[in-house]
Every structure is written in C-alpha cells, then in structure tokens.
Amino acid sequence: IQVLASEGGHIEYSPKSELEWELNNWLTNSLNVNLITCERIVSGAGLSRIAEWRLSKSDAKNHPFQKYIKELKFANDLEKILPEKICKLSNEGDILMNEIENIWLGAYGSLLGDIAIHELCLGGLWISGGTAPKHFKNFKSDLFLKQFSDKGRLKDMVKSIPVKVILDENFGLFSAACRAKMLLRRA
C-alpha cells in the first residue's frame, strides 16, 4: 500500500443534476465565491451547508430541524453536531434529512470515482478523515457505488476498484508517527 497525500477536496465541484446546479449556485452566492470546490460539499461542514440550503426552500420552512438549528446557533462544535444529527434523523426515516444525506453521498461518490481514475487506484481506494468512519455503511450503498462508477468509458475499470474505509479517526497521527520513526532510523 502506498499512501498518497492529497488536497483532492479542492477539485472543482461538478454538479450533475438540476438540483445539484441549484445547490452550486446557492453556495456561490452564500459564500460569495466564484468557484465551489468539492470540500465545500464533501465534508462534515459540507453536509451542514447542504442542509442549510435545502432547509431554505419553501417546502422545508416548518421542518423540525429548523428549530434544532436555531437552538444550536452559537454552539462551538456546530460543524460536528449537525452532520451527526442529520445522519441520525436520516437513519430514523426523516425524508428530508435522507434527501440531504443522499445529495452529499452522491457528490462524495462522484469525487472519489474521479480520484480513483486520476490516481489509478487499481489496488483499492482507502478513505479516511472525519466523516468517513461515521458513514462507512453508506459507502456500500447503491447510490454511492453508482456515482463512484458512473465514469463513462472507464466505468468497468472503476467498478473493479475496491473502496475501503479507515475507521480509526487517529489514522493520520499514527501514520505521521510511523513516518517520523522511519526518518529517525535513517538519521
């Protein structure tokens, strides 16, 4: 296994549906930026942004999550609390929260499929980070796998790439310690 450091989240977000274009335009205006990167969507903060956008639509004005957000408005760890709550409600059958989670998951799958092609991850793609361990069951879902492999002529190649999730949230620290130990041995 070779670990490749990446700032792949800074790749430009590529909306694929009318709904995703609407989200992209809302984010562009809301964040006052010219370019929306995948990190703005495919992250814990991104899941919160998708929820904020979706809850701003008229059909969601009276959703119970509106009250929950107002109660937490000044919480220090809002970017951690909201994604967990969105996923919990989605798993409990909340249709709107499920829609929000699916938009996020589709974008995540599409981005990882692009990265798998770009880096030729033929031996497998390992996902780590803050959101990955919390959503690992979703990386086996039909929605994720469809978005991951929907890559035109390279669809069959991407379908053959195994996707794994590193569940240890301290994986990066462990890896850094191993690298430091290796460098010390050389000195």
Language-model-derived ranges and their functions:
Residues 22-187:
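ATP-binding/phosphotransfer module of carbohydrate and carboxylate kinases, centering on a glycine-rich
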